[in-house]
From Swiss-Prot:
The gene is STT3A. One of its GO terms (biological process) is protein glycosylation. Residues 39-124, 164-174, 212-216, 265-272, 327-364, 411-414, 540-779 are lumenal. This is Dolichyl-diphosphooligosaccharide--protein glycosyltransferase subunit STT3A. The record marks 165 as: Important for catalytic activity. A motif (DXD motif 2) lies at residues 172-174. One of its GO terms (cellular component) is endoplasmic reticulum membrane. Keywords: Endoplasmic reticulum, Glycoprotein, Glycosyltransferase, Magnesium, Manganese, Membrane, Metal-binding, Transferase, Transmembrane, Transmembrane helix. Pfam families: STT3 (PF02516), STT3-PglB_core (PF21436). GO terms for molecular function: dolichyl-diphosphooligosaccharide-protein glycotransferase activity; metal ion binding. It comes from Arabidopsis thaliana. Expressed in the root and in the shoot. Mn(2+) binds at residues 54, 172, 174. Despite low primary sequence conservation between eukaryotic catalytic subunits and bacterial and archaeal single subunit OSTs (ssOST), structural comparison revealed several common motifs at spatially equivalent positions, like the DXD motif 1 on the external loop 1 and the DXD motif 2 on the external loop 2 involved in binding of the metal ion cofactor and the carboxamide group of the acceptor asparagine, the conserved Glu residue of the TIXE/SVSE motif on the external loop 5 involved in catalysis, as well as the WWDYG and the DK/MI motifs in the globular domain that define the binding pocket for the +2 Ser/Thr of the acceptor sequon. A motif (WWDYG motif) lies at residues 585-589.
Amino acid sequence: MAALESPLPGTPTAMRNAFGNVLSVLILVLIGVLAFSIRLFSVIKYESVIHEFDPYFNYRVTQFLSKNGIYEFWNWFDDRTWYPLGRVIGGTVYPGLTLTAGTIWWGLNSLNIPLSVETVCVFTAPVFSAFASWATYLLTKEVKGSGAGLAAAALLAMVPSYISRSVAGSYDNEAVAIFALIFTFYLYIKTLNTGSLFYATLNALAYFYMVCSWGGYTFIINLIPMHVLLCIVTGRYSPRLYIAYAPLVVLGTLLAALVPVVGFNAVLTSEHFASFLVFIIIHVVALVYYIKGILSPKMFKVAVTLVVSIGMVVCFIVVAILVALVASSPTGGWSGRSLSLLDPTYASKYIPIIASVSEHQPPTWPSYFMDINVLAFLVPAGIIACFSPLSDASSFVVLYIVMSVYFSGVMVRLMLVLAPAACIMSGIALSQAFDVFTGSIKYQLGASSNSTDDAEDNTSTNNAPKDDVSAGKTDKGEEIVKERSSKKGKKKEREPADKPSVKAKIKKKALVLPLEASIVALLLLIMLGAFYVIHCVWAAAEAYSAPSIVLTSQSRDGLHVFDDFRESYAWLSHNTDVDDKVASWWDYGYQTTAMANRTVIVDNNTWNNTHIATVGTAMSSPEKAAWEIFNSLDVKYVLVVFGGLIGYPSDDINKFLWMVRIGGGVFPHIKEADYLRDGQYRIDSEATPTMLNSLMYKLSYYRFVETDGKGYDRVRRTEIGKKHFKLTHFEEVFTSHHWMVRLYKLKPPRNRIRGKAKKLKSKTSSGLSSKSAKKNPWV
C-alpha cells in the first residue's frame, strides 16, 4: 500500500514534494544562519571576550587541554584553586564542552586555520545554537510533521531564554548541552516510531554526550522512564517502546559510569533509581505480552499470576535495596540541587550556599514573558493539538512541557530547559493554525470560483433551443428501460465509494472558517510573529549580550565603559608574586585564576562548604579576627567588589548577608541577627556595631567619604554610618578607576610589632627626655 501511495516520478505530486524538500533545506540553512548571527551582538558591541564567571574556568581548562593533551588533562591537579586543598580537575569537571572545543580547535589547526583557543571558545555556543535549532526541527517533525518542525526551529533560533546562555562568549556547559538534550529526545522519539535498534544505539551515545556535558542529564534519565511508565499504564506498550528504552538504560548507564565526575553515582544515587525501576517493570510487561502470544487463555491466566507474583517479589527486593541505600545517606541519596528542586524550601533551610546563587532562585512572572515572550500563550494551543490525535511521540512532548514548566518555576536556571519545549509546542500550534487558516482561505476562494462557473453553466443551459430538448426526450424514452436496470447496479457499486467522500467533505467543512475571519487571524499571527522577532532581537542586543567583566552605561554624556575588573586583574598579574594567594568571595575565583594567574582560596565550584564558610566568617568578623583567619590561610591580598560609587548593584555589600549565613552555618558565633537592625539590613547610621566593625564594611567604605564629602552610597541610596576610620591590619594597595574593585594587602605581623615597639620606644624616650630636661641645669 505504501508503494502505491507514493507518487510516481515526474508527476506533479512528486515534483511538488521535491520542491518542498529543497525549500525545507534552504529554510533550515537560513534558520542556522539566523541562530548564529543573532548571538554575535556581544562581539560587535564590545569585543571577543569570555563572559560571566564559570566560562573563565572552562576557557582555562580548554587552554590546558590544547597545550598539554588529553592524558595530562585527566590527571591534572590544580594547585591554583582552593588553597591549600587544591582540586583534581579531570575527576571533578564535565568534560563535554572542553573536549568539543578542543577537538574543534585541533581540527581547524590541522586544516591550517590558525584560530586561537579563545576565539574557538567564544564562537562555540553560537555554532551549537544552530545545531540545536536543526535538532528541534528533527524532533518536532517526528511528532507533527515538517511544517511544525520548521516553525519550532525558527522559534528556538531566537528564543531569549536560550540566547542568554548561548551568546558569543558564553562558554558554559549549556552551550552544547541543550543541543545534546534535544538530540537525545529526537533519537528516543525516532526509535519509538521506527523500532530501529540502530537509532536506539545512537540514542545511548547521544545520552553519553549529554552526561559528559552537563549535570542536567538527570532530567533525561527521569523524563524518559516517566514516559515509558505512562505508555505502559495507558495500554500503549509495544516492542518499539521496549527497543527505545531498554538499550538506553543499559548502554547509557554503562557509558555514563565512564565519565569520572559521575562514576558509580550512575547506579548509586537516587536520581537514577527511577530508570532502573521502570526497566524492571517493562521487562515484566514484555514477558506478560510474550506469554500471552504463546499460551491459551486459561494457561495465560495461570502464567500471569505466576509472573506477577515473581515480579512483585523481585520489585520488593529491589525496593528494599534502594531503601537501604537511600537510608544510609543523610540526604536520602539525593544531591543538594536535586532536593532543592523537589522541595523548593530545602536549600534556604539547610544549604545556603545553593540558595545564594542567583540562578537557583525561583523566577518571577515577568521573567517568563522576558524569556519566552509570546510562546507562553501558544503553548496551551500546542498541547491541545498534540491530543488530536494522541500518539506516543506527542504524549512525550506533552510530558516534557509539563515537567519543564514545574522545574522552571522552582529554579530560574531551568528556564533553559523550558525553552525547547515551549518552542516545540508553539511550533505545533502555529503550524496547525496556519494549516487551518490557509486551507480555509483556499477553500473559500475555490468555492467562490466554482459558484461563478456553475452560474454561467446554468444560464447557458436555460438558453438552449426547445427543439433540441424535445429531440433529447424522444431519444431518452427509448433507453429508459436499459438505464433503469443499469442504474440500479451502478448505485450499489457507487454507494460505498460515495459515502467516505461525503464524510470527508463534512469533516473538511467542519474545519473551514469564513474568509474574512481566516484573513484577520492570519494577519494577527503574522503580527504576533513580528512582535516576537522584535523582542528577541532586542533581548539579544541589549539584555543578554553584555559581558559581566566589561560594563557599560548610557548617559547624556554618551556611552561609559567600566573596565575595572580587567584593570584589577591586570594589576594583580603585574604587581604581585606568582605564588601570592588572593582571598575574595567565591564569585570571583574563576576570573582571578584565569585572568590574573594567582592562587585563590575559594572559587565558583563551591564543592567545599566549610572552606567557603571560613572566608565568609573572615569577611563578617572584626578586622583583627579576620586578619588572623586570612593569615592562617597564607593570604596576601583581599579583593572586594564595591559598587557604591557608580551604582553597581551586584557588589559584595549586597551579597554580605549570604556570607553571614554561610559562615554562621559552620561557625555558630556568627549570627545573622547581629547584622540586622529590627530585621532590616542597613549600612547607614542605624546599622549595628557588628555590621559597622565587620571587615567587609571597612574594606568597602574605606576612604569612601573622600569621593563626595558625604559618603553617599548610590546602590543603597543612603549615607554610610561610619565614615572616618583607619585600617590597622590591612593596607590599601589598589582601587580601580571607578572604585568597583578594591585590593588590600595584609600587613605582616613583624611590621605591626615593630610599629608597637617604635611607639613604646618613642614614649620611653620622650619620658626620659622630659626627666632629663628637668635635671638639666642649663635650662
